[in-house]
Amino acid sequence: MTEKQTWSQRFESALHPAIALFNASISFDIELIEYDLTGSQAHAQMLAHTGIISPAEGEQLVAGLEQIREEYRQGKFQPGIDAEDVHFAVERRLTEIVGDVGKKLHTARSRNDQVGTDTRLYLRDQILQIKTQLREFQRVLLDIAEKNVETLIPGYTHLQRAQPVSLAHHLLAYFQMAQRDWERLGDVYRRVNISPLGCGALAGTTFPIDRHYTAELLQFERIYENSLDGVSDRDFAIEFLCAASLIMVHLSRLSEEIILWASEEFRFVILKDSCATGSSIMPQKKNPDVPELVRGKTGRVFGHLQAMLVIMKGLPLAYNKDLQEDKEGLFDSVNTVKACLEAMTILLQEGLEFRTQRLAEAVTQDFSNATDVADYLAARGVPFREAYNIVGKVVKTSIAAGKLLKDLTLEEWQQIHPKFADDIYEAISPRQVVAARNSYGGTGFAQVSKAVSAARKEIGE
């Protein structure tokens, strides 16, 4: 890094090369260049609008910045480490293009409010992209659910067979998680969509700027009311990382279930070749790499959230260099969430097949209909807790005899309690067990069909 920095006039000696490298952020904040250019164009227009610079100078600056955008997109502008950061890289190139007029761009602006603006512009776009991905993920879940309203799957608590449910009902649980994620990102967007531009280094500026004008140009909903808060706030980034972490929680939970379902012990799903990998030594293997990677990458996003919280917890007002550390974790979290949503959507849509025959067998090979026996007695006047205790003893006796409840004879049922009649067999059949749970939000087929239709409307279909 041999060139003098913009701020170097106050210093008598050059920055140590290793420190210059340590201090530089251009290697990662180049991600913000398009947003930096857009924000700078709005700032230049405002300077001209308020008479701080001439209209002709404003036009020169805007045109020069647009030329840099084209150069960057064509691969002709690739700033090196000597630029320190994306802001200086742009300003230097702008001055090369338009001459000394380029040096007027930074009038009434600091890198502190500039980077805050860039990051918010970036995150606005990314939130909208992730929301679009969430909608596609939801559509795929609904497509599968719609075809499997009456497909049964064991439901679990404590990873022990509990009660059978509709496969569609199970998938709709993930739809609802994704819906909360979608709504949560909308809430975050509102607090991202606030302009700090014009807050200056920390105290505002002596120039007669118009912050509302730049906010309007950049389509910000409002502006920061306090300049100290505007340049030091990273709540919006933390909120996004919280929302991103919850998206990853939900994807990771689904991933864990798919990993289990694909195992020989469960055999509920088949992983198609397009979304699985093999072993370098064991030729029989088909590995669930996609859900395993999603599960693993979840920790990265959690880590970035924790890092951001730790960065912020002890910072005095206003800007501190610590805040340079907000970007890499933010960028990586955005990229991780987007990649995982894409991979999981493809996996569900193209790489997964439910083994419906195996699922049908699975729901008949356990005691997950025991609650329905208790409900059967309770519906016939036996207090539920008494019925519960009776059925608990029945299950214990059946296990000892190597029988399932469906294998008991009517005589055996009536020896247990005289209220049992021959309709007990229908009451404890898996399909009836599921169909009977027709309370709002339950797994009954009628309720699930309504839920699928309501979900379609929720996402605008």
From Swiss-Prot:
One of its GO terms (molecular function) is argininosuccinate lyase activity. InterPro entries: Arg_succ_lyase_C, Argininosuccinate_lyase, Fumarase/histidase_N, Fumarate_lyase_CS, Fumarate_lyase_fam, Fumarate_lyase_N, L-Aspartase-like. Keywords: Amino-acid biosynthesis, Arginine biosynthesis, Cytoplasm, Lyase. CDD domains: Argininosuccinate_lyase. Coiled coil: none annotated. One of its GO terms (cellular component) is cytosol. It is an enzyme of class 4 (lyase). It comes from the Bacteria. Strongly inhibited by L-arginine. Inhibitory effects are lowered at pH 7.0 compared to those at pH 8.0. At 42 degrees Celsius and pH 8.0, activity decreases to 77% and 25% in the presence of 1 mM and 10 mM arginine, respectively. The other amino and organic acids do not affect activity. It is found in: Cytoplasm. Catalyzes the last step of arginine biosynthesis, the conversion of argininosuccinate into L-arginine and fumarate. This is Argininosuccinate lyase. The lineage of its organism: Bacteria, Bacillati, Cyanobacteriota, Cyanophyceae, Nostocales.
